[in-house]
């Protein structure tokens, strides 16, 4: 009876140990409404290059149970809600100093020359050449909010293929930097993932050894009690006395 209770207790403890160690990284508690592609540990915060990448490409962030998820164009990055770099990034995004969702502040002044309407004799190549030397940052800033009276002039003077060229050039320049920062994120996350995967296995093995020792102790104690209650010499003497009594009764 005692052995059966001990076995049930062992099974319950093993189930509790497995349930407590099953959540690892993005799994367990972080699977649901806040999935994370990369999780940054509190012991190894991102370096300055990664922080610069996060400030530049941050689109939005979401407060989860015990961490914050930052949404980037390609992936999501999560960190503890009490970490310093997380608080800094949220404050930067809320104040409008970083991120795609906030308006950009352009330091260079806007110099725009009102060009006259082209005549039939003057070709439009001269006006097109003057627009080509404008910086791509100013062109991107002017496209969403054009100045009053200049919309018709831009549509006549700026070809569509030039705007596309500047946009694609900016994307090609930002792509190597994004790949390099993602590679650094993976390198920082590698040793941490190996350590976090080893700790649950060691704790589970320790629990199994402890429970096996408890079970062995209970079995040995039970056998000892049985030997004390029925010693071998006393049982043999009782058997001899019973045989003598039967022999005497048969003789009588």
From Swiss-Prot:
It is a single-pass type I membrane protein. Residues 115-145, 163-195 are annotated as: Disordered. One of its GO terms (molecular function) is low-density lipoprotein particle receptor activity. GO terms for biological process: positive regulation of cell growth; positive regulation of cell migration; receptor-mediated endocytosis; response to tumor necrosis factor; response to type II interferon; T cell chemotaxis. Residues 1-25 form the signal peptide. Its main location: membrane. One of its GO terms (cellular component) is membrane. Belongs to the intercrine alpha (chemokine CxC) family. Residues 220-252 are cytoplasmic. The chain crosses the membrane at residues 199-219. Residues 26-198 are extracellular. This is C-X-C motif chemokine 16. Residues 176-189 have a biased composition (Basic and acidic residues). Glycosylated. Pfam families: CXCL16. Disulfide bonds join 34-64, 36-78. Induces a strong chemotactic response. Induces calcium mobilization. Binds to CXCR6/Bonzo. Also acts as a scavenger receptor on macrophages, which specifically binds to OxLDL (oxidized low density lipoprotein), suggesting that it may be involved in pathophysiology such as atherogenesis. InterPro entries: CXCL16 (IPR026296), CXCL16_dom (IPR048585). Residues 125-145 have a biased composition (Polar residues). PANTHER family: C-X-C MOTIF CHEMOKINE 16 (PTHR14385:SF0), CXC CHEMOKINE LIGAND (PTHR14385). It is found in: Membrane. Keywords: Chemotaxis, Cytokine, Disulfide bond, Glycoprotein, Membrane, Signal, Transmembrane, Transmembrane helix.
